[in-house]
Every structure is written in C-alpha cells, then in structure tokens.
Amino acid sequence: MSQKRVSVHALSATVVATLLAVGLTAGLPSPAQAAGTTYFISAAGSDSNSGTSSSTPWKSLAKINATVLKPGDTVSLRRGDTWTGGVVTGQSGTAAAPITLNSYGSGSAPTVTGGKSGNCIRINGDYTIVDGLRGVSCGYAGISITGDHDTVRNSSASNNAVGIKAGSGSDFGKYTGNVLTNNSIMNVLTRGTNCGTAQAVNCNDDSGASGVLINGNDNEFSGNTISGSNAFSYDYARDGSSFEIYNGNRNNIHHNVAVDNNNFSEIGRSTGTADGNTYRYNLVRATCGANCTQAKGLIARGPGTSFGPTNGTVFEFNTVYLNGSQSQAVVCHASCPSSTVIRGNILVGVKNSLWINGSGWTERQNVLNGPVNVVLNSTSTTAPARFLNAPSDLHLTGSSPAIDRAGTSPTAFDLAGVAVPQDGDCNGTAAADSGAYEFDSPNC
C-alpha cells in the first residue's frame, strides 16, 4: 500500500473488494433469486404509469409504499434522482426469494432525504435487501431495519443521528460495503441540572451520532467504512460511535474501517443484555485534532454500572491508533467481566492503551503503546508497534513486534485480504500477527 494518506472512500473500496475476493461475505443472498415483479421509480416518472418498466416508471415514494410487495419483487430507484420523504416496506420475502430495493440507470446513487417519521429507508419485513441506496439528512436514521434476515449493502448515509439502525428484534442481518459519513447529529442533547448530586436531572441522557446503532442480535457487519460520528455533548463533552451496541447480543463486527469517530464501539444494556459481541480485524484511527481528544476504541462494562455487565466480549486482531491527549484504546470498567477477551491487538492510546479492572478476564498477545493499569500477560509487549507510516498507513514493517505474536486466528484473511497466518519472521513456522494487518515477508 502507498505510504501516502489513503482516503476513507479508497479504504472502503479496498476492504469491500477484499471481502468479496476472499469470500468473507459468506451468508449474503445470491444475486440469483426467484423471479418477481420489478417496480421502477424515477423523479421524472408518473404515478399514472404502469411502473413495471424503466420507460414507464412511477414518480413518488408514496406509490411504492402503498404497493403490497411479494417475495421476489424488486423496487428499483433511478440513479441520479432525489426524493424527499421515505421508503417504508412492511412485507417479507423469503430466503430463496427476498424483496430487493436497488437502483437502475447511471450516475450517483438514488438519494432519499427528509425522512418519514425520521427515517429515509425503513424495512419492517424479513428477508429484504437494500442495495446501493443513500439516506441523507433524514431526521433520525438513514436506513432503519426492524425485520430479520435483512441485508444492507453498498449503501450510504450521512448527516443523520444514526447512519444504519438494526433495531430491537432485528436479528440475523448482513451489513456490508456501506459508507457512513458524518452522522454527527445528537437526537438527544439536553443541558443537565444539579449534575453530580442526588437531584441530578438530564445529566446522562445525551445520545446520537452513531454510524451504526445495534439493538438486535446475531447480525454481521463487515467491509463498512464509518467516519465522522463525533459530536458535542453536554453530558460527555464529545459523543458518537462507529458501532453502538445497546441491548444487542452475539453481533459479529469484522473487517471494518473506522476513522475519526469519538468511539469505535461502546457496549451497554438496560433491561436486556449485551453479551457475546465479537470484533476482529477492524482498523480504528482517530487523529482529527480537538474533536478526537478523548477518542476511545472499545468501551465494555462490568456489573458495577447500570449499563453493564457486557459479558463475553471478544476483541482481537484489531489495530487501534488514537493520538488525542485523553484517548484510550480499550476500556473495560466497573469490574470488567471475567469472560472478556482482549487478544492479539495493537492498541495505541495516549492516556491509556488499556484500562481494565475486575479479575479473570483474558489479556494476551497484544502490542500496547501507551499507559496500562494492569500487569500484562507475558505474551504481550509494550515495544513500539513499528507501523509503515503512521497514522496514514498502519501496515507493519518487518521489525514490528506484532509479527507472529498471536499464534492462531479464527479468520483466514486479514483486513487487506492477506492469508493468515504468514511466516512473517521467517523462522519456518507461520503464526498470526497481532493487529488488523498480517505481514507477508518478501524474504521467505
């Protein structure tokens, strides 16, 4: 990779191409599906048209919202067009014949703005695919999913409180190849009173600025690029997250790129649970100056807070690079659960590379650059990570202590599509590297 700064969009294209090439998007519905009716929508169309060909498209989103879609049906929006309002579907497809929302023609992605009840695209049914659409300035969420087994891919959202929402009860979804940019609006932003006292009011209620908000279970997020989820907060000074998990379980977050967000992922719960969430081969970088001063990578919790515990969190083979004066790469507080695993990462933070309390958790095979508050496992190191050209290129050099440090990996490819493991130190035995990138030595 070039040592010049790589743009967020270039990173996104690279990651998606890699995932497709190496088959890490397994589980996505096949392009081949049972035939149904295709409905065409164009800003230049007419609702008196048949809507069933690109030469006779409908015009309004209301027309499609009133249509009873059946398994195998497709709604195709013309590229280059913009609609104000919202797309809402409530019918379900099947595994063999999903309902699909996509685009036709040439030009920029079809855009929905303004929102309907705060959401530009809302999918309430099961087995529905959203492919290549855009939600901008929607009021709340660019794309909101409440059904099961839904797919959102190759889509984008910006200037919302939430880019993509996997809502409560939205399970077994696939989210890949999406670009979520500057979703930095706070949907709750109130100045608290009597904060720090028993009479405190509105001192812990600010929320928003999420690239992805996950309230569902067993969803997969891969190949996405999230940037600019970072906003002012009365309660927290700054707020925002690439992947916010609240009452969501067993979600798999892997091979994503997160740039200049306030947090990479914060996990919490209220009356539900937030257990068994995993993170692998993600690149997290926050170097945006004042707005990234307090950036964090992962925030997990124990039972000593009303938002915890977050049991069974696994965070491994990630590269986190934060340079703000109060930045912390991984935090697990309030008696961090013993089921937490922090393994095989490169963690760079100025205030803390790792802050963790409680007992019984697993920390090993990490490269940590920045203060830590615990005695590290003997398999971890605080030696400089030795990146190729930090912060713009966080691949490893041949002298990095991350090479061959992590033993085995459950994943066959790194963030760039390099096979794992490689014999990076040329000692005759291949082993996985710590961090999101595997070093493939040219010398052996």
PLM regions and their residue ranges:
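Extracellular beta-strand/beta-solenoid scaffold signature
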Residues: 88-89, 114-121, 137-144, 159-170, ...
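Predominantly extracellular beta-rich ligand-binding scaffolds that present long acidic/polar faces
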Residues: 85-90, 96, 252-258, 271, ...
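Secretory targeting and sorting signals
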Residues: 2-34
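C-terminal accessory segments
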Residues: 376-441
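Surface-exposed loop/turn segments connecting beta-strands in extracellular beta-rich domains
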Residues: 85-86, 104, 115, 136-139, ...
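Acidic Gly/Asp/Thr-rich repetitive segments characteristic of extracellular carbohydrate-active
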Residues: 43-78, 82-84, 416, 433
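Right-handed parallel beta-helix/beta-spiral solenoid domain characteristic of secreted/periplasmic
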Residues: 43, 57-58, 74-82, 90-141, ...
